[in-house]
């Protein structure tokens, strides 16, 4: 059996196991050339979390205290009996690596970070419809936990340990504005002292700084996505439907890399659709035909073991840049290069966003699309007309990963998903963009205070481009940064040469 290069030298899984399951004791692996993920990754996550809590809150945490997490719940689609493909709640997955719904997980706040996975007791007919009912011992060996119980045994376990405090997650996701729902179990709060304030910032911060094993999984997702983006670039031609490009990406990452899911809805935007930041949703379902002068903006990222990539490639459908496309693309590329050259621990992400904005505005001034002084453009927020989103976001188990406004963050800045200072171990996207969005341009042109900065004659030459975004996935290192998606063709010459082969 062939093994992915990153698996060389590691203890091989039993091949027979992988005829039946993606799991073997201590590993997640889909065989062939896919990445073998050691599930000790999640044991180390638990140990990191417990160590961080005990070191920061030693005086507060009493003996016999426990973390309690709840997995995602199995659901049906509206009022039907159709069960959508389950995706695990990400805090639970980070801690246990389990993709089983309707579970609870317990972690002892002790030096051993004692772990208990509580699984649902399934009815006998489950085996008829869904497959073999696995034993407690099976899950214990797979997920490397200290004990497996049924959910209905959980309360008795906590009582037997004289649990003094149960720590649960309660907090708000700063990207969605949604509040995380605490574990719900009958009698929990009536029986135990429950603390829902301490855990959220600690576990979120642990997710911000990736372990080396987490980085390897993300790197694999990025490699799969880079390979698929290059495959799509070679397939693109005038007359194709956007959804055909999406289907090429989805097939490639699944067939060649074992990535059944993508981290988010694929954005395959061509022509003017490339100015729609989150194109591809149900109302705009990647359904347009790529035109002769169409410019493609494809934002797609593969998911593996619940971690994801997030990459955007922008290029002309013909493989040859027009003069106007060349100007806008080079402006965004210059911003991307400047940011990556400046990224290192201790650098403010707000400053990186401002750097990208300055690069783009300077290029638009040079092209004659804008007029006036660069500082006046910045002061009048002209940058947000062409670059209306933040420079990037944390990346991991979520596409917009958690922790953007924890730690040393500055006050929230409109459109920025984080204002933090960079630290080694962070994985963050860098995605400068320049778009010609009609309603933003109309607003700016209808205001005399901002209209004076626009050269309408030149602007009209560019409005049909739509938009350009260059998005890479970046690991912050001790001395700088590592562009995980660096194997993509990015310069104009590289793209034209690659697409004409």
UniProtKB/Swiss-Prot annotation:
Its EC number is 3.4.13.9. Mn(2+) 1 binds at residues 299, 310, 471. Keywords: Dipeptidase, Hydrolase, Manganese, Metal-binding, Metalloprotease, Protease. InterPro entries: Aminopep_P_N (IPR007865), Creatin/AminoP/Spt16_N (IPR029149), Creatinase/aminopeptidase-like (IPR036005), Pept_M24 (IPR000994), X-Pro_dipept-like (IPR052433). GO terms for molecular function: manganese ion binding; metalloaminopeptidase activity; peptidase activity; proline dipeptidase activity. SMART domains: AMP_N. Belongs to the peptidase M24B family. Eukaryotic-type prolidase subfamily. GO terms for biological process: proteolysis. It comes from Dictyostelium discoideum (Social amoeba). CDD domains: Prolidase. Gene3D superfamilies: Creatinase/methionine aminopeptidase superfamily, Creatinase/prolidase N-terminal domain. A dipeptide binds at residues 278, 310, 400, 417. It comes from the Eukaryota. Dipeptidase that catalyzes the hydrolysis of dipeptides with a prolyl (Xaa-Pro) or hydroxyprolyl residue in the C-terminal position. Mn(2+) 2 binds at residues 310, 393, 431, 471. Binds 2 manganese ions per subunit. It catalyses: Xaa-L-Pro dipeptide + H2O = an L-alpha-amino acid + L-proline. Disulfide bonds: none annotated. Pfam families: AMP_N (PF05195), Peptidase_M24 (PF00557). This is Xaa-Pro dipeptidase. Its cofactor is Mn(2+). Homodimer.
């Amino acid at each position: 059996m062939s093994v992915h290069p990153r698996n060389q030298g590691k203890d091989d899984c039993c091949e027979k196991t992988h005829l039946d399951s993606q799991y073997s004791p201590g590993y997640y692996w889909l065989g062939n050339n896919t990445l073998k993920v050691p599930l000790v990754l999640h044991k180390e996550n638990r140990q990191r979390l417990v160590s961080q809590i005990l070191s920061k809150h030693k005086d507060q945490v009493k003996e016999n205290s426990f973390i309690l997490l709840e997995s995602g719940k199995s659901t049906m689609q509206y009022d039907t009996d159709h069960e959508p493909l389950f995706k695990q709640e990400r805090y639970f997955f980070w801690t246990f690596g389990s993709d089983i719904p309707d579970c609870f997980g317990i972690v002892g706040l002790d030096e051993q970070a004692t772990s208990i996975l509580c699984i649902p007791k399934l009815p006998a007919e489950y085996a008829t419809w869904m497959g073999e009912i696995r034993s407690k011992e099976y899950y214990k060996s797979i997920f490397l936990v200290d004990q497996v119980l049924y959910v209905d045994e959980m309360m008795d376990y906590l009582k037997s340990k004289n649990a003094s405090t149960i720590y649960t997650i309660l907090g708000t996701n700063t990207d969605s504005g949604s509040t995380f729902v605490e574990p719900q179990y009958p009698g929990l709060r009536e029986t135990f002292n429950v603390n829902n304030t301490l855990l959220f910032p600690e576990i979120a911060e642990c997710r911000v700084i990736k372990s080396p094993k987490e980085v390897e999984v993300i790197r694999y997702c990025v490699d799969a996505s880079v390979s698929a983006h290059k495959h799509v670039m070679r397939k693109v031609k005038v007359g194709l439907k956007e959804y055909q490009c999406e289907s090429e990406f989805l097939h490639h990452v699944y067939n060649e890399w074992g990535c059944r899911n993508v981290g988010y809805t694929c954005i395959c935007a061509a022509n003017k659709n490339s100015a729609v930041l989150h194109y591809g949703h149900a109302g705009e379902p990647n359904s347009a035909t790529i035109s002769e002068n169409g410019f493609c903006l494809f934002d797609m990222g593969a998911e593996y073991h619940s971690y994801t990539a997030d990459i955007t490639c922008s290029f002309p459908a013909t493989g040859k840049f027009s003069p106007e496309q060349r100007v806008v693309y080079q402006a965004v590329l210059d911003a991307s290069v400047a940011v990556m050259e400046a990224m290192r621990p201790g650098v403010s992400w707000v400053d990186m966003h401002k750097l990208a904005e300055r690069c783009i505005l300077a290029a638009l001034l040079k092209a004659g699309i804008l007029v006036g002084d660069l500082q006046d453009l910045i002061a009048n927020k002209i940058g947000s007309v062409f670059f209306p989103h933040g420079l990037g976001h944390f990346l991991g188990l979520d596409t917009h990963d958690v922790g953007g406004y924890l730690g040393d963050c500055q006050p929230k800045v409109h459109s920025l998903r984080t204002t933090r200072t960079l630290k080694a171990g962070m994985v963050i996207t860098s995605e400068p963009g320049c778009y010609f969005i009609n309603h933003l341009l109309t607003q700016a042109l209808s205001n005399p205070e901002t209209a004076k900065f626009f050269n309408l004659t030149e602007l009209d030459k560019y409005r049909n481009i739509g938009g350009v975004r260059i998005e890479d996935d970046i690991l912050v290192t001790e001395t700088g940064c590592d562009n995980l998606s660096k194997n993509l063709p990015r310069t104009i010459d590289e793209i034209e040469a690659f697409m004409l082969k």
